[in-house]
A protein has these predicted regions:
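Active-site glycine-rich loop that binds ribose-phosphate moieties when present
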Residues: 1-12, 48-67
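Solvent-exposed alpha-helices and their adjacent loops that cap or buttress functional pockets
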Residues: 10-14, 32, 67-71, 94, ...
């Protein structure tokens, strides 16, 4: 493990850097559900919501984020992928050798993602989230503004810390990130039979 001064001198993040997240969690997982379970979802939700979920596919590239990161003093960047935002936060902290303090309420979400995940009893924080990126930066708000200027919503969701703890805070409640779990989307592969109880 690198000491804080070594991380700075080698261009790696020290404690106190902003953790920035782009777009919204659960984009790809929700798009897949909307495409593969369209008829079922239309029986429960308005067509406009299902079409919106299918349209999340257009957000899956993170090339613009990468281009901005390269000129904005970003020390680390990672695509949010399988296992969702929780898995990617863990993996990025491991790569960077830092702890994390994340405010759960600041993680960007879309209500469509939440409602579709709730329908299938899936955790939206642990579902395939390609299209979103995590970045460590000294000037988090400035990075968010630079991303907004090219049409990419972003938010500071926490900061890096010394030590190994990966803390998720939800109001006064504190929890610690677990090791990454299998992606929630995998549940759907064996879920169809159970959905009979929901009127499939």
């Amino acid at each position: 493990r690198l000491e804080a001064a070594d991380r700075v001198s080698r261009g790696l993040p020290a404690a106190g850097q902003a953790v920035v997240m782009t777009k919204w969690m659960g984009l790809e997982g929700t798009a897949i559900l909307a495409q593969e379970k369209e008829a079922q979802l239309l029986a429960r939700f308005p067509r406009v919501m299902v079409e919106k979920a299918k349209g999340f596919e257009k957000y899956l590239s993170i090339l613009p984020e990468a281009a901005t990161a390269g000129k904005s003093g970003v020390s680390f960047m990672q695509a949010v992928r399988e296992g969702g935002i929780f898995a990617s936060l863990w993996e990025l902290a491991e790569r960077a050798g830092v702890g994390l303090h994340i405010d759960l309420m600041k993680i960007p979400m879309d209500q469509t993602v939440v409602e579709i995940c709730n329908y299938y009893d899936l955790n939206p924080y642990e579902i395939l989230s390609s299209g979103s990126a995590l970045l460590f930066a000294k000037q988090g708000q400035q990075l968010c503004e630079e991303l907004a200027a090219i049409g990419i919503p972003a938010a500071v969701i926490g900061q890096t810390t010394d030590g190994n703890d990966r803390i998720i805070q939800n109001g006064e409640e504190i929890r610690y990130l677990d090791l990454p779990k299998p992606d929630q989307i995998r549940k759907i592969l064996n879920y169809s039979a159970k959905m009979a109880n929901k009127g499939e």
